A protein has these predicted regions:
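Loop-to-transmembrane helix entry/capping segments in MFS-fold secondary transporters
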Residues: 15-24, 153-154, 241-260
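Helix-to-loop junctions at the C-terminal end of transmembrane segments
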Residues: 170-183
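Intracellular loop-helix junctions on the cytosolic face of multi-pass helical membrane proteins
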Residues: 4-143, 147-153, 300-303, 308-336
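Juxtamembrane helix-start elements in MFS-like secondary transporters
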Residues: 60, 152-160, 208, 297
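Residue-level signature of mid-helix packing/kink "hotspots" within the transmembrane helices
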Residues: 34, 164-172, 266
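C-terminal ends and interior cores of transmembrane alpha-helices
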Residues: 193-207
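Transmembrane alpha-helix termini and helix-breaking/packing motifs in multi-pass membrane transporters
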Residues: 33-57, 265-296
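Hydrophobic core of transmembrane alpha-helices in multi-pass small-molecule transporters
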Residues: 1-3, 209-229, 233
């Protein structure tokens, strides 16, 4: 992913085009999520070795192997059916200008220091961690919410897909809003919409299916608005840092954001498991037909709704107060 994200920064210096490329990437990523959400539980049911539960090692292993093989095939198709096209500058002046914008190469430690001095890169990196932490919370929480709050695994498909389909749909219109209001405004609006979705589901979730779908659609729209802008904002933040320090941080900058995303996913998964264990979750109770303790239901509700809402609210305040990358980039470009 690091080379892929880096190419978005290198393909064009146009802020709108960067945002548009990031939005397209998110559209197809979301489409993949919809496919997985629609087939995951079905595949577990097909490959389970138990008549009492679908959550067996055999079922998870075979299901994940199928997804991994599909990913490898698609990756090979991408590699062998695409080509980098590099065009040199037509004039010396243009070449000098591009070199100045690209910055100079530096050692690893010097590049790291340049990144840490770039407050906008730090903010988008932290925001990426938060968003991916939240995504894994409700991605894992979908299964547990259906089983231990709704007590009906048949609800899983619409619970998961109401988020993914809304996310997928909204990203077809976000480029228009981005062109009019800018990436930062759309990203922040997405966080507000996402937060309202989590808050509404926390307060009214479980009342009726329609109400839950409405708030899940809000979550999906928020994730789509923020996610569609994220890669473009990373590219802008790296460009800002390069102009400010004169050091090329494209590779390491994108690597840092990618690492933050993976840490968010990994830590979110671990926190979810630790919290459930702390609440008294015991998987063997399901096989015996015994209900989980009430504390488990309470913890699932907190992890699925309240924790994401709290994290979004904090991140939104940070963005509003400290993130002004687009404004500062325009000032720097006007002064050149």
């Amino acid at each position: 992913l690091v080379p892929y994200y880096s190419m978005i920064s290198l393909m064009t210096a146009n802020p709108y085009e960067r945002g548009f490329l990031g939005n397209i990437q998110q559209i197809f990523q979301t489409l993949g999520n919809v496919v997985v959400n629609s087939t995951f539980v079905t595949l577990l049911g097909i490959f389970t070795s138990s008549t009492e539960t679908i959550y067996t090692q055999r079922a998870f292993t075979i299901t994940m192997l199928i997804y991994c093989i599909a990913m490898i095939l698609v990756t090979f198709f991408c590699v062998f059916s695409t080509k980098e096209r590099v065009h040199s500058a037509e004039s010396t002046d243009e070449n000098d200008k591009k070199s100045a914008n690209a910055g100079r190469e530096a050692g690893t430690w010097e590049t790291v220091k340049a990144l840490l001095k770039n407050k906008y890169w730090v903010i988008v990196t932290v925001s990426s961690f938060v968003v991916f932490f939240i995504v894994i919370m409700f991605a894992m929480g979908n299964v547990y919410y259906c089983q231990y709050v709704l007590y009906d695994m048949g609800q899983y498909s619409w619970v998961a897909n109401s988020v993914s389909i809304a996310q997928f749909a909204v990203m077809f219109v976000t480029p228009a809003f981005m062109k009019k209001f800018g990436k930062t405004a759309v990203y922040e609006a997405g966080m507000v919409v996402m937060g309202l979705g989590f808050l509404g589901f926390a307060v009214f979730g479980g009342s009726t299916r329609i109400v839950m779908i409405i708030f899940n659609v809000l979550k999906g729209c928020g994730v789509g608005m923020a996610g569609g802008m994220a890669l473009g904002m990373v590219a802008d933040a790296i460009t800002y840092g390069t102009k400010k320090t004169g050091i090329d941080t494209v590779g390491l900058g994108n690597a840092g954001v990618s690492a933050a995303q993976k840490i968010g996913l990994g830590l979110g998964t671990a926190v979810f498991g630790w919290a459930l264990n702390g609440a008294g979750y015991d998987g063997s109770l399901d096989a015996q037909g015994i209900a989980q303790p009430e504390s488990v239901t309470t913890m699932v509700k907190f992890l699925y709704n309240w924790l994401p809402f709290i994290m979004i609210a904090i991140m939104f305040v940070i963005m509003i107060m400290f993130y002004h990358c687009e404004r500062d980039l325009k000032k720097m470009e006007a002064a050149e």
